[in-house]
Amino acid sequence: MGVTELGKLIGKEARREVKLEALAGRCVALDAYNALYQFLASIRQPDGTPLMDRAGRITSHISGLFYRTINLMEAGIKPVYVFDGKPPEFKLAEIEERRKAKEKATEELVRAIKEGRRDEVAKYAKRAIFLTNEMVEDAKKLLTYMGVPWVQAPSEGEAQAAYMARRGHCWAVGSQDYDSLLFGSPRLVRNLATSPKRKVGDEVVELSPEIIELDAVLKSLRLRSREQLIDLAILLGTDYNPDGVPGIGPQRALKLIWEFGSLEKLLDTVLRGVTFPIDPVEIKRFFLNPPVTDTYTTDVTKPDDAKLRDFLVHEHDFGEERVERALERLKKAMGKLRTSALDSFF
C-alpha cells in the first residue's frame, strides 16, 4: 500500500518525468508484488473479471509481466524483480485487515454480478484482488524461463531493492509506492510496470516514467536526513501504521519535524501520552535496518524458448502466434542487453 500521504508532500521540484528510453542502460530493481498487483488490477475483461485460462486460473499477472518486461527490455532497461519475503511481525495485523477488506469486496463483487450492476463490477473486482502463492510462483517461473533475474527478499521487497540500489548494483527502485526512499534508495522510478495510459474519470491520460531522487526530496522538504523523512512518514502513516497520528496532517507533521528534529523528541513532548498500536520507534528501526540478503544476481541469461512456449501456450492457453512474435522481440532485446557493455549497468 505504501506511504501515500508522504507522496502528497513531494512536489514537482522533486519529480522528473522522462521518456522510457531515457532509462536505457540502467538496471532497475522492480518491486515484484507491486507490479503483479497492478497487472491484476488493470488487465481485465470488459466485464471486470481477470484474464483466465481454460482451467479457470487467473493469468492477468502472467500476461502483464511477460509483455511489460519485454517492453522495458526493448527500451534498453535491465529489470530485476524483487519478491517479498516474511513481513515483520508488527505488519501482520495490517495484513489481516487488508484480507478482511478483500473478502468484503469479494462479497460485494458477487452481489454486483448477480444483480447486473456492471458499472460496479470493475470497482469491486479491483478491490477484491488476492495475490496467491501460486501466482507468485508463476511469476518466478516465467522470469526464469525469460532469463530475467529475480531476487527473493528475506523480508520486504522494497527494502531489498533499496539495498541493491544503495550498493550500486541497480540504478533505481521501480515501484508506485514511496517506501523505497525510506529504505534508502537513492532514487525511485514510478510508472514503469504500468500501462503507458490510464483512465482517470472519463479521460485517458498518458503516464510517463517519473524519477524521484532522495536528495531532491530531502531538499524540497527542508529535511536534514533520511531519518527525518522516516519520522515524517511515520507521523503520516506507513504500511505498518496506516493511520499515522490522528489529527496530524501533512503540513503540521512537516512543521513538527522542522521544530523538534526527530520522532524521539516528539514522543517525549507533543506526543507524550499518545497510545500507539505499534511502537513508532520500532517502525523507524525497521526502516533503517531491515533484513536484506547479499545472495542475488542482476545478470540476464538466455531465454528458454521451449519452456516459455510450454508454460504460456500449452499450460495457460496464450495465443501461439502472439507468443511467437513476443519471443522474437524478447530474443532481440535480450541480445542487445547481453552484447552491450554490461559494465555500464549499475
From Swiss-Prot:
Residues 1-102 are annotated as: N-domain. GO terms for biological process: DNA repair; DNA replication, removal of RNA primer. The keyword DNA damage applies. Its cofactor is Mg(2+). Pfam families: XPG_I, XPG_N. Its EC number is 3.1.-.-. Disulfide bonds: none annotated. Mg(2+) 2 binds at D177, D179, D239. Binds 2 magnesium ions per subunit. They probably participate in the reaction catalyzed by the enzyme. May bind an additional third magnesium ion after substrate binding. Mg(2+) 1 binds at D31, D84, E156, E158. The keyword DNA damage applies. SMART domains: 53EXOc (SM00475), HhH2 (SM00279), XPGI (SM00484), XPGN (SM00485). GO terms for molecular function: 5'-3' exonuclease activity; 5'-flap endonuclease activity; DNA binding; magnesium ion binding. SUPFAM superfamilies: 5' to 3' exonuclease, C-terminal subdomain, PIN domain-like. Residues 120-261 are annotated as: I-domain. Keywords: DNA damage, DNA repair, DNA replication, Endonuclease, Exonuclease, Hydrolase, Magnesium, Metal-binding, Nuclease. Transmembrane segments: none annotated. PANTHER family: FLAP ENDONUCLEASE 1, FLAP ENDONUCLEASE FAMILY MEMBER. Structure-specific nuclease with 5'-flap endonuclease and 5'-3' exonuclease activities involved in DNA replication and repair. During DNA replication, cleaves the 5'-overhanging flap structure that is generated by displacement synthesis when DNA polymerase encounters the 5'-end of a downstream Okazaki fragment. Binds the unpaired 3'-DNA end and kinks the DNA to facilitate 5' cleavage specificity. Cleaves one nucleotide into the double-stranded DNA from the junction in flap DNA, leaving a nick for ligation. Also involved in the base excision repair (BER) pathway. Belongs to the XPG/RAD2 endonuclease family. FEN1 subfamily. Interacts with PCNA. PCNA stimulates the nuclease activity without altering cleavage specificity. This is Flap endonuclease 1. It comes from Pyrobaculum arsenaticum (strain DSM 13514 / JCM 11321 / PZ6).
